[in-house]
UniProtKB/Swiss-Prot annotation:
Belongs to the bacterial ribosomal protein bL17 family. The gene is rplQ. This is Large ribosomal subunit protein bL17. GO terms for biological process: translation. InterPro entries: Ribosomal_bL17 (IPR000456), Ribosomal_bL17_CS (IPR047859), Ribosomal_bL17_sf (IPR036373). Pfam families: Ribosomal_L17 (PF01196). Keywords: Ribonucleoprotein, Ribosomal protein. Part of the 50S ribosomal subunit. Contacts protein L32. It comes from the Bacteria. One of its GO terms (cellular component) is cytosolic large ribosomal subunit. The keyword Coiled coil does not apply. PANTHER family: LARGE RIBOSOMAL SUBUNIT PROTEIN BL17M, RIBOSOMAL PROTEIN L17. NCBIfam families: L17 (TIGR00059).
Length: 187
């Protein structure tokens, strides 16, 4: 007979832990990002990602499964109408956890958990194009070096002196601006 895992629970009891995660998930889908303790954020991540996966399917049965957890119908509508279709091309990794400064008072490690808003679509065609480009790059590099050497050989002494004068003028301007910048910092 399977036995439940031993150990500490968030909130003390199983029902309280379930309520905590339901409330955290509701806030996450409502606001897009929330600040909570690091351990709660790490525990919330798989919980929230499973709900997003249900929303991606979009069936009535999946909606009812999500409604068992998230009681706010407006948030469920947002989840199924906006968030689920947004991640239709993405297989997992819908959330990110960013560690922040510890909380004042009890010094608990805090984190921000947020929904990832960037689209990352890497199809096989993109991957093949990158592989081909990386294979062609070593062959093209020697040709570019020859062009650079030819251009350097064609440069006349007058052009070199002109370039040196421009570089010196720029250095003089930056040297003149440096004391003014230091005075501005002191003020």
């Amino acid at each position: 007979m399977p036995k439940p895992k031993k150990g500490a629970r968030f909130g003390g009891s199983a029902s309280h832990q379930k309520a905590i995660f339901a409330n955290l998930a509701t806030a996450l889908f409502e606001h897009g990002r929330i600040t909570t303790t690091e351990s709660k954020a790490k525990a919330l991540r798989p919980y929230a990602e499973k709900l997003v996966t249900h929303a991606k399917a979009g069936t009535l049965a999946h909606r009812r499964e999500v409604l068992k957890v998230i009681r706010n119908k407006d948030v469920v509508h947002t989840l199924f109408a906006e968030i689920g279709p947004f991640y239709a091309d993405r297989d997992g990794g819908y959330t990110r956890i960013i560690k922040t400064v510890p909380r004042k008072g009890d010094n608990a490690p805090m984190a921000i958990i947020e929904l990832v808003k960037e689209k990352t679509v890497t199809s096989e065609a993109d991957r093949a194009r990158r592989v081909k480009a990386s294979q062609d790059a070593p062959a093209a590099a020697p040709a570019e070096e020859n062009v650079v050497e030819a251009v350097e050989a064609e440069a006349t002494d007058a052009e070199v002196e002109n370039a040196d004068a421009v570089v010196e003028a720029i250095e003089d301007e930056t040297a003149a601006d440096a004391p003014e910048a230091e005075e501005a910092k002191k003020d």
